[in-house]
């Protein structure tokens, strides 16, 4: 019965190795070592990438919190600005009303005596 193929388990030595041919056995070992080195490098790079993604996620969470706080502050600012705008509008209207009433009173004070003077003659 044969076992299933597993690329991570080295194969049995070939007939050339068993017969003592050292040159034939060193080539597969060098290839295996080179491939293992590439795998180790890839694993290292992937671990770095995973670490960077994790850090990025933390920064994104922090940025999301700051964005939420800014949105709440902006909403409060908008409400306060509207309140101040309405208050200033009423203040402006009161000032205009006072000026109009003052002009009417001034005209009455000037025109009524003149009209009574000419009407009385």
UniProtKB/Swiss-Prot annotation:
Gene Ontology, cellular component aspect: cell cortex of cell tip; cell division site; cell tip; cytoplasm; endosome; Golgi apparatus; medial cortex; meiotic spindle pole
Cytoplasmic side: 1-97
Keywords: Coiled coil, Membrane, Transmembrane, Transmembrane helix
Membrane-topology annotation of the record: Single-pass type IV membrane protein
PROSITE patterns: SYNAPTOBREVIN, V_SNARE
Pfam families reported in the protein's UniProt record: Synaptobrevin
GO molecular-function terms, A-Z: SNAP receptor activity; syntaxin binding
Subcellular location: Membrane
Segments on the Vesicular face: 119-121
Transmembrane parts of this sequence: 98-118
GO biological process: ascospore-type prospore membrane formation; intracellular protein transport; vesicle fusion
InterPro entries with a match to the protein in the record: Synaptobrevin-like, Synaptobrevin/VAMP, V_SNARE_CC
v-SNARE coiled-coil homology domain boundaries: 31-91
Family from the record: Belongs to the synaptobrevin family.
Role of this protein: Involved in membrane trafficking during cytokinesis and cell elongation.
Entry protein name: Synaptobrevin homolog 1
Gene this chain is encoded by: syb1
């Amino acid at each position: 019965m044969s076992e299933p193929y597993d690329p991570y388990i080295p194969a049995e030595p070939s007939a050339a190795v068993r017969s003592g041919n050292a040159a034939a056995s060193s080539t597969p070992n060098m290839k295996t070592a080179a491939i293992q080195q590439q795998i180790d490098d890839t694993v290292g790079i992937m671990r770095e990438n995973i670490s960077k993604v994790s850090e990025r996620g933390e920064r994104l969470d922090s940025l999301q919190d700051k964005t939420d706080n800014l949105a709440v502050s902006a909403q409060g600012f908008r409400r306060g600005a509207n309140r101040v705008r309405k208050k200033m509008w009423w203040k402006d209207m009161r000032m205009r009303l006072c000026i109009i009433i003052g002009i009417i009173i001034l005209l009455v004070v000037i025109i009524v005596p003149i009209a009574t003077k000419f009407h009385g003659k």
